[in-house]
């Protein structure tokens, strides 16, 4: 059965380092929303309405800094039972060197050292345990990479050492852009980490789409997403969808409704919509 895993990178107030490289971008007014913790509160209220209305769950991949600065909002979203909460590091720290271009402005961020990665993962998992009573098992790596963590046993060792059981890190194509091809979930057996499941996030990230096509292109994104639903339904694929808290506000989801309509369309086509963690659990027996 075709399946969509819905995940929201919940990163408002944790991405200032990255966004500081794009102050000259014409999209910076939209990016500014990602600096204000109140954006996270607005977004989670909106996402709760959307998911309650459509009747499907999702995973929030939360940065630790976002979690602490919008704690009440994340707790309220989790309490609805609609959202599984996993992590997105503490400060949106990269596992690999990042080079990203948006509107002819290019930003470069170096990969974080191993000790920083491990401490960020460990600390964020502790926060989720302390404030939500959640045992964190999943990680969305910031940015996403072509081939995920393939051929990087050093990074997989950090993931394992932090007690994480699945990672969603393959989110770029060979040109470091989107759309990402429909590579399917796999375990890192070749690297010696068969206990770690990779759940790629394919097609278009919402932020990459809007950076490419403009933040007023929600209707066009909906058309593209419907095409993706048709494709996975026909080929019986797993689609790891990646959206962002602040992008729901920046793209005016409440008025445009591209996200709500996408979820409704998926259900209408007989596609299962679930969380990343649910898929990991039933695939691995975790």
Residue ranges and their predicted role:
Residues 4-8, 58-60, 85-88, 137-139, ...:
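Hydrophobic faces of well-ordered beta-strands that scaffold small-molecule active sites
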Residues 1-84, 135, 140-144:
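Active-site beta->alpha N-cap acidic-glycine motif
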Residues 20-28, 95-112, 209-213:
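Surface-exposed, active-site-proximal loop segments in enzymatic domains
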Residues 68-69, 108-198, 252-257:
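Catalytic domains of cell-wall/extracellular-matrix polysaccharide-remodeling enzymes
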Residues 45-55, 67-93, 129-132, 160, ...:
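Acidic (Asp/Glu)-rich catalytic clusters
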Residues 191-227:
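A conserved mid-domain beta-alpha-beta active-site/ligand-binding segment of alpha/beta enzyme cores
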Residues 36-41, 61-72, 93-98, 114-117, ...:
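Acidic-and-aromatic substrate-binding clefts and catalytic sites of carbohydrate-active enzymes
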Residues 166, 171, 219-286:
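C-terminal domain-boundary segment and adjacent tail
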């Amino acid at each position: 059965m075709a399946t969509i895993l819905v995940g929201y990178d919940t990163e408002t107030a944790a991405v200032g380092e990255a966004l500081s490289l794009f102050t000259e971008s014409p999209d910076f007014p939209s990016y500014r929303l990602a600096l204000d913790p109140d954006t996270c509160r607005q977004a989670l209220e909106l996402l709760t309405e959307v998911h309650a209305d459509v009747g499907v769950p999702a995973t929030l991949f939360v940065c630790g800094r976002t979690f602490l600065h919008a704690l009440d909002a994340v707790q309220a979203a989790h309490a609805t039972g609609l959202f599984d909460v996993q992590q997105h590091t503490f400060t949106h720290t990269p596992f690999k060197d990042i080079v990203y271009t948006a509107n002819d402005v290019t930003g470069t961020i170096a990969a974080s050292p191993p000790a920083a990665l491990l401490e960020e993962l460990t600390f964020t998992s502790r926060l989720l345990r302390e404030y939500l009573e959640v045992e964190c098992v999943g990680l969305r790596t910031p940015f996403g990479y072509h081939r995920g963590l393939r051929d990087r046993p050093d990074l997989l060792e950090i993931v394992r050492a932090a007690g994480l059981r699945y990672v969603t890190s393959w989110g770029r194509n060979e040109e470091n852009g989107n759309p990402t091809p429909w590579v399917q979930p796999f375990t890192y057996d070749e690297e010696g980490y068969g206990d770690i499941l990779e759940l790629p996030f394919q097609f278009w990230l919402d932020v990459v789409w809007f950076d490419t096509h403009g933040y007023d292109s929600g209707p066009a994104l909906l058309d593209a997403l419907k095409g993706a639903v048709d494709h996975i339904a026909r080929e019986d694929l797993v689609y790891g969808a990646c959206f962002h808290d602040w992008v729901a506000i920046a793209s005016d989801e409440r008025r445009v409704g591209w996200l709500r309509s996408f979820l409704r369309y998926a259900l209408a086509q007989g596609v299962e919509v679930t969380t990343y963690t649910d898929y990991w659990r039933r695939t691995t027996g975790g």
